[in-house]
């Protein structure tokens, strides 16, 4: 198959004419660290600004929804909140005073006699064991058992 006669003999004359210089390559354009830092800082600032813009947009949507809901579904405060100006500040509309409801009872007039004073009543209600067990089963542990109701005083 392949005998000794097929071996290659070196040609000394041909080797002398070939040059062994390395091929020249053009330098590849590489980005320096200086440009990478600028791009990173720019991307960070753009991300922060976009996040702030998104938060402002969500805030405006919530604010307009609350305003729309307040105009469409007015919450009527109780008679006590209509006549006590300190408590009416806790309502959603802080700037406008509440107009009295013509269908409600007139406010109690303050006495001009200095001897009379305001009296307060404190009441506690005791539930029977049967009802308290029923309430404990149906409600969670943080249930507030205090019930508030309007009390009308007549002379």
From Swiss-Prot:
It comes from Homo sapiens (Human). One of its GO terms (cellular component) is membrane. The modification Phosphoserine is found at residue 140. Its main location: membrane. The keyword Transmembrane applies. Keywords: Membrane, Phosphoprotein, Transmembrane, Transmembrane helix. This is Transmembrane protein C1orf162. It is a single-pass membrane protein. The chain crosses the membrane at residues 41-61. Residues 1-28, 92-114 are annotated as: Disordered. PANTHER family: TRANSMEMBRANE PROTEIN C1ORF162. It is found in: Membrane. It comes from the Eukaryota. Residues 19-28 have a biased composition (Low complexity).
């Amino acid at each position: 198959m392949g005998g000794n006669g097929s071996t290659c003999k070196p040609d000394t004359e041909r080797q002398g004419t070939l040059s062994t210089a390395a091929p020249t390559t053009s330098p590849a354009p590489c980005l320096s660290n200086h440009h990478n830092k600028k791009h990173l800082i720019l991307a960070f600032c753009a991300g922060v600004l976009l996040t702030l813009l998104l938060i402002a947009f969500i805030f405006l949507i919530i604010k307009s929804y609350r305003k729309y809901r307040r105009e469409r579904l007015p919450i009527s405060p109780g008679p006590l909140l209509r006549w006590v100006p300190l408590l009416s500040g806790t309502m959603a509309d802080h700037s406008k005073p509440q107009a009295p409801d013509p269908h409600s009872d007139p406010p109690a007039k303050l006495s001009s006699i200095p001897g009379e004073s305001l009296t307060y009543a404190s009441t506690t209600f005791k539930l029977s064991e049967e009802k308290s067990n029923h309430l404990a089963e149906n409600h969670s542990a943080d249930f507030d058992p205090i019930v508030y109701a309007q009390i009308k005083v007549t002379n």
